[in-house]
């Protein structure tokens, strides 16, 4: 029986570096940035959730369930991950940011392979030089650990997953796959690079 893998696209942040604009809805090459992410991960998972704390109606137009953080106050990506872990019945949950339009088409396959090779509970993606802490594949059983971490007042993903049994899935062959678009300048540069 094949594994059931769901994904959550994290679009719940404040987007300070994007001038406060909701990053997932910012146009990139003629379509909202989140649409690029959806197109990359949809073939790899069973269901997609979108974590958003504003503009939920607009996000719902993409045809996926929209969930908000369980805790108020824009507590960062872990809060969105926690909300998704409470919604999924999957064997694994993939977490990705809404502002990475070039995610690998073999992301889930390679992350799952890293988990199985190490016997880990989760995997974090790496571009070969640094880990990408928002790009995780994890077992939903990690929810209690994540919730306790947040309740203790911690928010840094790196500190949380460092306490877990995790593997690293390396994508050195795709070094630009995890490029984030955080500013209007980066958006303009990405558009130029695509022409």
UniProtKB/Swiss-Prot annotation:
Where does the UniProt entry say this protein principally localizes?
Answer: cytoplasm
Which superkingdom?
Bacteria
- Name any Gene Ontology BP term: bis(molybdopterin guanine dinucleotide)molybdenum biosynthetic process
What GO molecular function annotation could you give as one example from this UniProt entry?
metal ion binding
**Catalytic function, reaction form:** Mo-molybdopterin + GTP + H(+) = Mo-molybdopterin guanine dinucleotide + diphosphate
For this protein, the record's Pfam families field holds: NTP_transf_3
Q: Which InterPro entries match?
A: MobA-like_NTP_Trfase, Molybde_CF_guanTrfase, Nucleotide-diphossugar_trans
Detail which positions bind Mg(2+).
99
Report residues binding GTP.
10-12, 23, 51, 69, 99
GO cellular-component terms in the record? Answer: cytoplasm
List the Gene3D superfamilies. Spore Coat Polysaccharide Biosynthesis Protein SpsA, Chain A
Q: What is its EC number?
A: 2.7.7.77
Cofactor needs? Mg(2+)
**Compartments (UniProt record):** Cytoplasm
Instruction: Enumerate the UniProt keywords alphabetically.
Output: Cytoplasm, GTP-binding, Magnesium, Metal-binding, Molybdenum cofactor biosynthesis, Nucleotide-binding, Transferase
User: What job does the chain carry out?
Assistant: Transfers a GMP moiety from GTP to Mo-molybdopterin (Mo-MPT) cofactor (Moco or molybdenum cofactor) to form Mo-molybdopterin guanine dinucleotide (Mo-MGD) cofactor.
What does the record note on quaternary structure? Monomer.
Q: Which family does it belong to?
A: Belongs to the MobA family.
Give the domain note.
Answer: The N-terminal domain determines nucleotide recognition and specific binding, while the C-terminal domain determines the specific binding to the target protein.
Q: HAMAP family recorded for this chain?
A: MobA
PANTHER family from the xrefs? MOLYBDENUM COFACTOR GUANYLYLTRANSFERASE (PTHR19136:SF81)
Q: What is this protein called?
A: Molybdenum cofactor guanylyltransferase
This protein's encoding gene? mobA
